[in-house]
Regions:
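Ferredoxin-like alpha/beta domains used as RNA- or RNAP-binding modules
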Residues: 1-20, 26-135
């Protein structure tokens, strides 16, 4: 069986609070772990997409519209739909399993991931990932 859930693959979440949101696979567990026996992955995604920026907006308004909110989540493979896109964003050292369990580590990891996502958005790369999924 070909493994399509690789690091950096862009996926769309199908179930739960973040259904319909885009995310990136940070780490995959094909054989499961002791706590979760099923195959799953750790994803980092966009909770809130950046708004559309127009030319007449001021610099302050442009900065406000360019903000993103992100999330981390362990997701079952059956609850994600892989896409053909990849995002070469290095979040492996930012996000880890223990960072999700403790609250202070999670807050700092979310801030780091947010800055990386915003930086990627401002450079103009991976435009598909930062646009809202219309359905």
């Amino acid at each position: 069986m070909v493994k399509c859930m690789k690091l950096g693959k862009a996926v769309i979440l199908l179930q739960g609070r973040y259904a319909g949101k885009k995310a990136v696979i940070v780490k995959s567990f094909d054989d499961g772990t002791d706590e979760k026996r099923y195959s799953h992955c750790l994803v980092a995604g966009l909770k809130k997409y950046p708004s559309k920026v127009i030319r007449k907006d001021s610099a302050k308004k442009t900065a406000k519209k360019s903000r993103v909110k992100c999330f981390f989540k362990f997701v079952n493979y059956q609850h994600v739909m892989p896409t053909r896109y990849t995002l070469d964003l290095d979040l492996k050292n930012v996000v880890s399993g223990d960072a999700i369990s403790s609250n202070d580590k999670k807050v700092t990891a979310l801030k780091e991931a947010k800055s990386k996502f915003e930086e990627r958005f401002k450079t103009g790369k991976n435009r598909w990932f930062f646009s809202k999924l219309r359905f």
